[in-house]
From Swiss-Prot:
Residues that bear Phosphoserine: S927, S1012, S1020
Coiled coil (residue ranges): 809-886
Name recorded for this polypeptide: RNA-binding protein 27
Residues with PTM Phosphothreonine: T447
Length: 1060
């Protein structure tokens, strides 16, 4: 709905709402005005307003809405205006327009006529008041001339209304009612400060005269020299626009703004103009395509749209056919004539064109209101801009010059530096602020500022010889300056400075603002996934890991050939294919190989100490991938931590994430650089013992976890003792892709143990078996105390630690840790309550013993309390026992059940693989069942791999690729179970708990058990079979070392004997 005077309606609503509403009347009035402005039919709008205002007004809603719409139709909310008498004034003006044949009266006739009409009441009238009267008369004459000229050229009228409208809206937006009161005071009575205001007014009007002189017809005589600035500035033609007069104060540009604010609200032409009507498009649609060119009112605080985004919002019509197409960005037009000697037309003081800056070639002005100006680039040579360069000639009435005059009060942009492109927008009303020193220097030199809305743009071609100033009428794409950035949004003057920051700031994409990628190449050429492991809490730096180029191996002591860590973190500065590719050069990647980044460790610094714990860090960093290791208080720093991921990609995601770590922007995440120092064997041994102690502690705390998790942890920890004996442990890793599934029996090396292991180490792996006898119990263990030091003992495949299972292990471990923590807290609280009750019980008993002469009533009360305490104490003890019993591991499945479940899972996996369905969950389940079956020893003989590795072999004898594989998986029949005697049947459960949690060996209830190796009746396998198994495993290992994902690249670039 159309509202004539929004402010009057708001004040009327505030008065009406004050007695009937508890809310702020002014805020609610604004809300009501916003509701009424909705573009809806009357009935819908009325119902909508009643619905929205019902919350505030309740019972008064319907009456208020009726009054509101009635007032909108009758307009009784408008203030009562005094009877306006200047009705016949337009008729008088029309008569004067008919009578007058010249555009401007001579100044002398005006003075004489004014003296006759208005005789001076005082003889001692000051000269300044006479000058003020003369200038006011001259303004009235100019207004009449302008009204007459309106019919000749409507375009000038639009521009003039645009400027008047802008000055009017700015004065309204600033709300300077003081200037209005001063202007009224000057017209009614004499102000003592009249002379000072008169000087400012005359200065401002003289500048307005020069500003408006470009719209005076050609036949109009130039103004007298008295109109020019009287401070010593030279007299210049009326067509020259002077922006910075010499008598202007040489400080900042605030004096312009203050002066303009104080005077723009008063009537510029000395007569009461009717208020402009509201713009219908702006009220109904929320925007007006004409913007500042619209002759209707847009309110006190109009919405200003940056014209950079305007073409994408409004489809403009194509440019007129008479105009040439816009040149490509950055192209320069030929030099334009300027002032200088020589025959020919030129706007300069010389009689002909010259190389100086000029505007003889004017920019075309768009004919339509909504059409943006065409993009034209004007080269202005390097000599500084003078006043004569801003001359607009009006030789041809059909064209007009670009308004190269910044309106008074605007903030000036910085001076033009050398070799920079300036693009100028014709309709851009937004200006940048100029620094005080540059502004004062400009005013001292007498040079005008750049043209309208100059935007700083770096040169497109820095290699060119000279790039001068360029003014463009199009709205350019904002680029980045090096030195200048204006203020941001100014709420006091949104139409001037609202888009100042957006013009100069470059917006980078997210990928550019992320941290630099510091991940690099290593000497390894194979795309084999790194070793997966469980989370291990460390208090010392981890043992460094290096990867060789030929065979994927985990070296648990520093390698002398290890490259600098910069290669692990950042890409090489040199292209990989530019280096020499010698056959014996193993430290360089192959030709056109993918960059292999292997650094998976991140250092986190400046962590608050209360947040530097495993739980908090795991919550944040587990979002980006599988965490292998978390180490708090890294290197003794309580505010540092070390995070190790499974792959380099996950570490890169974590370090390049823009999310604040633990909602703290001060926490820093860096790549971890390994020290070049090589730890001694002693430090390695200490680290190994510490890890074993940590795992032992964890196993005692989390003994209720599944046994295969416990087994994986110990196996990872026990893979390290080979460093003490100088051995290198080879870790085989075979990634399971979606197209192949592998069912392997656990090899011999998992059951043999290690040379460095002892009986106490092996006792960590005691697990239950399903078989039970009459008075004996069979336990299985993968460790053998009497073992032969062979090559197979040093090979430990990471099937149990592969990437597909480590994620599940981590999740299960995390959940179990949380549950365990809750249980421990509950148990701790119960224990505290139990201790307090026991103390209270002791205190009451001692009281009874001391006070033997106690009254029988008190004694009965104490006895009753003691009885209740005893019941509660026994109840708490039972609860503590049951909680500890619940934490014990549940009974494992029998061999038959486990084998049946394993077969069913394999069958489901085959069906899904044949149908092409997702097999991720089945693979996880199958891997867990494989671990359990290997622990129970129920994997059948000779099953081997159910499918080939990839089926893409090319007949090169590679580990059975594409031929069904040679892995026959021979079962080891050496004893791996214990026969335990010396206990009765009722003690079976306690014995199971004893062997699964405590590690007490043969001691049980003050008795010594008789333990010996269980010898089954099946004959043991021959030595030849053992040697054959070792060979088959080596064959499989050679196949596993080669990645399946990059077979074709290896086939292409691998050196072969028949190619040499």
């Amino acid at each position: 709905m159309l509202i004539e005077d929004v402010d009057a309606l708001k004040s009327w609503l505030a008065k009406l709402l004050e007695p009937i509403c508890d809310a702020d009347p002014s805020a609610l009035a604004n809300y009501v005005v916003a509701l009424v402005k909705k573009d809806k039919p009357e009935k819908e709008l009325k119902a909508f307003c009643a619905d929205q205002l019902d919350v505030f007004l309740q019972k008064e809603t319907s009456g208020f809405v009726d009054k509101l719409f009635e007032s909108l139709y009758t307009k009784n909310y408008l203030p009562l205006l005094e009877p306006v008498k200047p009705e016949p004034k337009p008729l008088v003006q029309e008569k004067e327009e008919i009578k007058e044949e010249v555009f401007q009266e001579p100044a002398e006739e005006e003075r004489d006529g004014r003296k006759k009409k208005y005789p001076s009441p005082q003889k001692t009238r000051s000269e300044s008041s006479e000058r003020r009267t003369r200038e006011k008369k001259r303004e009235d004459g100019k207004w009449r001339d302008y009204d007459r000229y309106y019919e000749r050229n409507e375009l000038y009228r639009e521009k003039y209304d645009w400027r008047r409208g802008r000055s009017k809206s700015r004065s309204k937006s600033r709300g300077l009612s003081r200037s209005r009161s001063r202007s009224r005071g000057r017209s009614k009575d004499r102000d003592p400060n009249r002379n000072v205001e008169h000087r400012e007014r005359s200065k401002f009007k003289s500048e307005r005269n020069d500003l408006e002189s470009s719209y005076v017809p050609v036949s109009a005589p130039p103004p007298n020299s008295s109109e020019q600035y009287s401070s010593g500035a030279q007299s210049i033609p009326s067509t020259v626009t002077v922006i910075a007069p010499a008598h202007h104060s040489e400080n900042t540009t605030e004096s312009w703004s203050n002066y303009y604010n104080n005077h723009s609200s008063s009537n510029s032409f000395g007569r009461n103009l009717p208020p402009k009507r509201r713009c219908r498009d702006y009220d109904e649609r929320g925007f007006c395509v004409l913007g500042d060119l619209c002759q209707f009112d847009h309110g006190n605080d109009p919405l200003v749209v940056d014209e950079v985004a305007l073409p994408s919002m409004i489809p403009f019509p194509p440019p007129p056919p008479g105009l040439p197409p816009p040149p490509p960005p950055g192209m320069l037009m030929p030099p334009m004539p300027g002032p200088g000697p020589g025959p020919g037309p030129g706007p300069g003081p010389g009689p002909g064109p010259g190389p100086g800056p000029g505007h003889s070639m004017r920019l075309p002005v768009p004919q339509g209101h909504g059409q943006p100006p065409p993009s034209v680039v004007l080269p202005i040579p390097r000599p500084p801009i003078t006043q004569s360069s801003l001359i607009n000639s009006r030789d041809q009435p059909g064209t007009s010059a670009v308004p190269n005059l910044a309106s008074v009060g605007t903030r000036l942009p910085p001076p033009l530096p050398q070799n920079l492109l300036y693009t100028v927008s014709e309709r851009q009303p937004m200006y940048s602020r100029e620094h005080g020193a540059a502004a004062s220097e400009r005013l001292q030199l007498g040079t005008p500022p750049p043209l309208l809305a100059a935007r700083l743009v770096p040169p497109r071609n820095l290699m060119g010889s000279s790039i001068g100033y360029h003014t463009s009428v199009s709205s350019p794409t904002p680029l980045v300056p090096d030195t200048y950035e204006p203020d941001g949004y100014n709420p006091e003057a949104p139409s001037i400075t609202s888009s100042g920051r957006s013009q100069y700031r470059q917006f980078f994409s997210r990928t550019q603002t992320q941290r630099p990628n510091l991940i690099g190449l290593t000497s390894g050429d194979m795309d084999v996934n790194p070793r997966a492991a469980n989370i291990v809490i460390q208090t010392e730096p981890p043992v460094p890991v290096s990867i060789n180029s030929n065979i994927t191996r985990v070296v648990l002591e520093p390698d002398s050939r290890k490259r600098a860590m910069s290669g692990l973190e950042g890409p090489l500065t040199k292209k990989p294919w530019l280096g020499k590719q010698g056959n014996n050069n193993q430290n360089k990647p192959g030709f056109l190989r993918k960059n292999q980044y292997t650094n998976t460790k991140l250092e986190v610094k400046k962590i608050p100490q209360e947040l530097n714990n495993i739980t908090k860090l795991n919550e944040h960093f587990s979002k980006f991938g599988t965490i292998v290791n978390i180490q708090v208080a890294f290197k003794g720093d309580p505010e540092a931590a070390l995070i190790q991921y499974l792959t380099n990609e996950e570490a890169r995601k974590a370090i390049s994430s823009t999310e604040a770590v633990l909602n703290n922007r001060f926490i820093r995440v860096l790549w971890h650089r390994e020290n070049n120092e090589q730890p001694t064997l002693q430090s390695s041994a200490q680290l190994l013992l510490q890890q074993q102690q940590t795992l032992s502690h964890l196993s005692q705390q989390h003994h209720h976890l599944p046994q295969h998790l416990h087994q994986q942890q110990v196996l990872v920890a026990q893979s390290a003792p080979s460093t003490v004996h100088g051995g290198i442990q080879k870790m085989m890793s075979k990634p399971q892709t979606s197209g192949a599934y592998v069912l392997n029996k656990v090899p011999v090396k998992h059951r043999l143990g290690h040379a460095g292991g002892n009986q106490s180490d092996a006792s960590h792996l005691l697990n239950q078996s399903g078989g039970a006898g009459e008075d004996c119990q069979i336990f299985s263990t993968p460790g053998h105390p009497k073992m032969i030091y062979s090559s197979s003992n040093l090979k430990t495949p990471s099937k149990l630690c592969s990437g597909s299972k480590s994620h599940d292990v981590q999740e299960v471990l995390k959940k179990k840790q949380e549950a365990m923590k809750l249980q421990q807290d509950m148990r701790k609280k119960r224990q505290e309550v139990l201790e307090k009750q026991i103390e209270c019980q002791k205190m009451l008993i001692s009281k009874l013993e001391k006070n033997k002469n106690m009254k029988p009533e008190e004694r009965a009360n104490i006895m009753k309390t003691l009885k209740e305490l005893g019941e509660k104490i026994s109840q708490l003890k039972d609860e503590l026992k049951t909680s500890s019993a619940v934490s014990t591991p549940s009974k494992v499945k029998t061999k038959t059940e486990a084998q049946k479940e394993l077969l069913d899972t394999e069958l489901d996996l085959h069906k899904r693989l044949s149908s092409g369905e997702d097999t991720t969950e089945l693979r996880k389940k199958l891997s867990q069942l494989q671990v359990e079956a290997a622990r129970l020893g129920i994997l059948p003989v000779g099953r081997g791999k159910t499918m080939s590795s990839q089926g893409r072999g090319r007949g090169r004898g590679r580990g059975g690729r594409g031929r069904g594989s040679l892995n026959h998986m021979v079962v080891d029949h050496r004893p791996k179970a214990l026969t335990v005697g010396g206990f009765i049947e009722e003690e079976k459960e306690d014995l199971l708990q004893h062997f699964s949690t405590a590690n007490q060996g043969p001691k049980f209830k003050d008795r010594r058990l008789q333990i010996s190796w269980h010898k089954p009746k099946v004959p043991s396998i021959s030595t030849e079979t053992e040697e054959e198994e070792v060979k088959e495993e080596e064959t499989e290992t050679s196949d596993l070392f080669l990645p399946d994902d990059d077979d074709e690249d290896e086939d292409e670039y691998e050196s072969r004997s028949w190619r040499r």
